[in-house]
C-alpha cells in the first residue's frame, strides 16, 4: 500500500477550483487501486492534511496521468498559498478502536 500525504495552506477557492477538485476526486475514485482518503484540519492554523491510500504504486501512477489532476498541479498557485506532497510505501499498518469508517483501508 502507498500513502500520499498532501499538506496544504489554502488560498482563495473559486467555482473553477471546486469544479476541478470534484473532477480530480472522481478520477481518483474511478482509478483501480484507489482505497480512500482521510482529511485533517489543524486547529491552530488553516493548514489541511489529506492522506490518500493506494493499493500500489502502479495505481498511484495511473491516477497521476489523469488530465484533470495534471491541470490542477499546474495551477496550484491560483488556489493554495503553499503545498507539500509526500509519497510513502506502507510496510505495516495496525491499530484498533477508531471504527470501520476511520481505520486505514487495508
Task: Give each language-model segment a name.
Residues 1-48, 57-65, 81-106:
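Short S/T/G/P-rich N-terminal loop/turn motif that feeds into the first structured element of a domain
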Residues 70-74:
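A common structural junction motif
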